[in-house]
C-alpha cells in the first residue's frame, strides 16, 4: 500500500528503466550494445519505446569494444551486461575506455534487491553472498558508480552518472536490480535536460593563466603546437583549429592525436613521436623553444618508446583539469576556457615555415609491379585512396604504427587503442564506429587489422552483417603476431597462428550476396583494387586479405618494440 500511495503522489510516474533509457536518448545515444542475460532481460524490453536500437553482440568483451568505437564517433555510448559473468567479460574493454578517456555508460542488470539483502546463493555469484564484489572491481575503471537501489535516489544517480561520463569522458557504472526496473519515479524531471556544460573556470585564475601563457608565447622565437588524444576526448578540437588558424604556428600531432586536426591545412606538419618521427618533423619540434602541448598522453607506444626529446622547461601543457606552464602547475582549471581566451588575446606570434607533407611514395621503393606489398609503400598509398570524412580504425601492431605515414584528407576520424593496446579491440570498435557512422549519414568505415588480432574478436563481423553495416576490412596477413616477434621470440611458435581463409568468414556468418571478398598479394593487385570504384563505395561489407612479408614492419614499430624489449629485461 505504501508503494501505491507513493506512486499516486507522483505528478508524472515513469518506470526506472524508461527514465534511464530516455536520458540515454537525450544525450545522443541511439543504439545500445551488449548481451542479454536473465538479470537484464526485463530492462531490455524498454529500449524500443525509448527510441533505442538493441545491437546484440556476440560476447560482452566485443560489446565493450563496440561501445568504445561507437562513443569515439558519436560522443558517448551505452553498454548493457548481466551481473557477474557478463560484466566481468566486458571489464577489459571498460578498462581500455577508462585509460583512453572514452565515455561509456555501463549498465549492469542485477538480482532482486531482496536476494542481495538475504545473501542468496544465486547463479553468477561467487557463492559467498557478496553482491558488491563486482561493483568494487568496476569502481577502479569507472569515474562513478551509481547503484539504483532506492527510488528516492534513482533519478539523481542516473543524471549525475551520465553527466560525469560526458564531462570526464570516462566510463560510469550503473547497477539496475530486476525489481527496480518497473519501480515508479517522478518523470517530470525528464523535462529538464541534464546539464552537460563544463564547470566554468574561476575568472581571475583563468585570466592569470592566460596572461602567463601569452607572455611565454610572445617571447618565443620558434613555437609549435603539439596535439594529442585528450584534445579529442575533451572536445577542444574547435579551439585547436582556431588557434592553428589565428597563430599560423606549425602544428603537429602525436600518434594518439591522429585526426585531431585537418591534415590538409597549410600549418599541419605531421606526426611527432620522438625517434619514430620523420627527420624534418623531429628537428622542427625538438628545436622549438616553446611547445603548446594540448591533451598529451606520453605513453610508451605514443612516444615511440619514450624517445621524446622535448623538455618541460620549453612546454606548456593544456589538460582538462589543469594547465602546466613550464614547471608551474595551475590545478582546477580546464583547458577549454583558457584556450578560448588565448585565441581572443593572441596578437602576433613568431611562426616558422611548416615542412611540406604529401602521400608520395618513398623514392627508393618500387611504385608498382609484381613485388610484395611493403609497409613503406602501403601506408602512403592508403593516403591517396582515402576520402574526406572517412573513419579509419587501426589495430595494435603494424597498422597502429603504419598509419603514422598516412596523411589524411580533411575530416577523417582516426580510432586506435595506443595506450591500452588490447589486441582484437579494433574489430569490435569497427562495428560500433560503423553503426554510429550509419546513424550520422553513412560515412565510410575502414579497418586495418592483423591476422593475429582478428582471431580474437572476429565474431563481430557477424554483428556487422546482422546490423547491415558496410565497413571495408583489410586483414594484414603476415603469419602471426608481428609486434610480439619484434619484442621477443622471433621464431617462437607462440607468436605463430593458424592460417585462416579470412575472406570466406563473412559467408560463414551469413553474409550471402551482400558481401564481397578480395585477396591481394602484389602492388599491382592493390593498385587495381584501389582503382575499383565499386570497391570504394559498396553498400555492403567487404574484406580484403592483404598479404605482406612476415619480416616487414613499419620502422616506428621496430623502434618501439626494441625499447619495450629492453625494459622487460
Swiss-Prot record:
Alphabetically, the GO molecular function entries are: magnesium ion binding; pyruvate decarboxylase activity; thiamine pyrophosphate binding
What InterPro entries has UniProt attached to this entry? Answer: DHS-like_NAD/FAD-binding_dom, PDC/IPDC-like, THDP-binding, Thiamin_PyroP_enz_cen_dom, Thiamin_PyroP_enz_TPP-bd_dom, TPP_enzyme_TPP-bd, TPP_PDC_IPDC, TPP_PYR_PDC_IPDC-like
**Keyword NAD attached:** no
Cofactors, names only: Mg(2+); thiamine diphosphate
Which SUPFAM superfamilies does this chain map to?
DHS-like NAD/FAD-binding domain (SSF52467), Thiamin diphosphate-binding fold (THDP-binding) (SSF52518)
Alphabetical UniProt keywords = Decarboxylase, Lyase, Magnesium, Metal-binding, Thiamine pyrophosphate
| Subunit text | Homotetramer.
Q: What is this protein called?
A: Pyruvate decarboxylase
Amino acid at each position: 500500500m505504501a508503494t501505491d500511495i507513493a506512486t499516486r503522489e507522483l505528478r508524472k510516474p515513469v518506470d526506472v528503466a524508461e527514465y534511464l533509457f530516455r536520458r540515454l536518448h537525450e544525450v545522443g545515444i541511439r543504439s545500445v550494445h551488449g548481451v542479454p542475460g536473465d538479470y537484464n532481460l526485463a530492462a531490455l524490453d524498454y529500449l524500443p519505446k525509448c527510441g533505442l536500437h538493441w545491437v546484440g553482440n556476440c560476447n560482452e568483451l566485443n560489446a565493450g569494444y563496440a561501445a568504445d568505437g561507437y562513443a569515439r564517433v558519436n560522443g558517448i555510448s551505452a553498454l548493457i551486461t548481466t551481473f557477474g559473468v557478463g560484466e566481468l567479460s566486458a571489464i577489459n574493454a571498460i578498462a581500455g575506455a577508462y585509460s583512453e578517456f572514452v565515455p561509456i555508460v555501463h549498465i549492469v542488470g542485477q538480482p532482486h534487491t531482496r536476494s542481495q539483502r538475504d545473501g542468496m546463493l544465486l547463479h553468477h555469484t561467487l557463492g559467498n553472498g557478496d553482491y558488491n564484489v563486482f561493483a568494487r572491481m568496476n569502481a577502479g575503471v569507472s569515474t562513478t558508480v551509481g547503484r539504483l537501489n532506492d527510488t528516492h535516489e534513482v533519478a539523481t544517480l542516473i543524471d549525475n552518472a551520465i553527466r560525469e561520463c560526458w564531462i570526464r569522458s570516462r566510463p560510469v557504472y550503473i547497477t539496475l536490480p530486476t525489481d527496480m526496473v518497473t519501480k515508479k519515479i517522478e518523470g517530470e524531471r525528464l523535462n529538464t535536460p541534464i546539464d552537460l556544460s563544463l564547470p566554468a573556470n574561476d575568472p581571475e585564475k583563468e585570466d592569470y593563466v592566460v596572461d602567463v601563457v601569452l607572455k611565454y608565447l610572445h617571447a618565443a622565437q620558434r613555437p609549435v603546437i603539439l596535439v594529442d588524444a585528450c584534445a579529442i576526448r575533451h572536445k577542444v578540437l574547435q579551439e585547436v583549429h582556431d588557434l592553428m588558424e589565428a597563430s599560423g604556428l606549425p602544428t603537429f600531432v602525436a600518434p594518439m592525436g591522429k585526426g585531431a586536426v585537418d591534415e590538409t591545412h597549410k600549418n599541419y606538419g605531421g606526426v611527432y613521436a620522438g625517434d619514430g618521427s620523420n627527420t624534418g618533423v623531429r628537428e622542427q619540434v625538438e628545436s622549438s623553444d616553446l611547445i603548446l602541448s594540448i591533451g598529451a598522453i606520453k605513453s610508451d607506444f605514443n612516444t615511440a618508446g619514450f624517445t621524446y626529446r622535448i623538455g618541460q622547461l620549453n612546454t606548456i601543457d593544456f589538460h582538462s583539469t589543469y594547465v602546466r606552464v613550464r614547471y608551474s602547475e595551475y590545478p582546477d582549471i580546464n583547458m577549454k576556457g583558457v584556450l578560448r581566451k588565448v585565441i581572443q588575446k593572441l596578437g602576433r606570434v613568431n611562426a616558422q615555415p611548416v615542412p611540406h607533407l604529401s602521400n608520395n611514395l618513398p623514392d627508393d621503393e618500387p611504385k608498382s609491379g609484381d613485388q610484395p606489398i611493403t609497409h613503406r609503400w602501403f601506408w602512403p598509398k592508403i593516403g591517396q585512396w582515402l576520402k574526406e570524412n572517412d573513419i579509419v580504425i587501426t589495430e595494435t601492431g603494424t597498422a597502429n604504427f603504419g598509419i603514422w605515414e598516412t596523411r589524411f584528407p580533411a575530416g577523417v576520424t582516426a580510432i586506435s587503442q595506443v595506450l591500452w593496446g588490447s589486441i582484437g579491440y579494433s574489430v569490435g570498435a569497427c562495428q560500433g564506429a560503423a553503426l554510429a557512422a550509419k546513424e550520422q549519414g553513412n560515412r565510410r568505415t575502414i579497418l586495418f587489422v592483423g591476422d593475429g588480432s582478428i582471431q580474437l574478436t572476429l565474431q563481430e563481423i557477424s554483428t556487422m552483417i546482422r546490423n547491415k553495416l558496410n565497413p571495408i576490412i583489410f586483414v594484414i596477413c603476415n603469419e602471426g603476431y608481428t609486434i610480439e616477434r619484434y619484442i621477443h621470440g622471433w621464431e617462437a611458435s607462440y607468436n605463430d597462428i593458424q592460417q585462416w581463409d579470412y575472406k570466406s568468414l563473412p559467408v560463414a556468418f551469413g553474409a550471402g550476396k551482400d558481401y564481397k571478398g578480395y585477396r591481394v598479394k602484389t602492388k599491382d593487385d592493390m593498385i587495381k583494387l584501389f582503382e575499383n570504384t565499386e570497391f570504394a563505395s559498396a553498400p555492403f561489407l567487404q574484406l580484403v586479405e592483404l598479404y605482406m612479408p612476415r619480416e616487414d614492419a613499419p620502422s616506428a614499430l621496430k623502434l618501439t618494440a626494441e625499447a619495450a624489449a629492453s625494459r622487460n629485461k
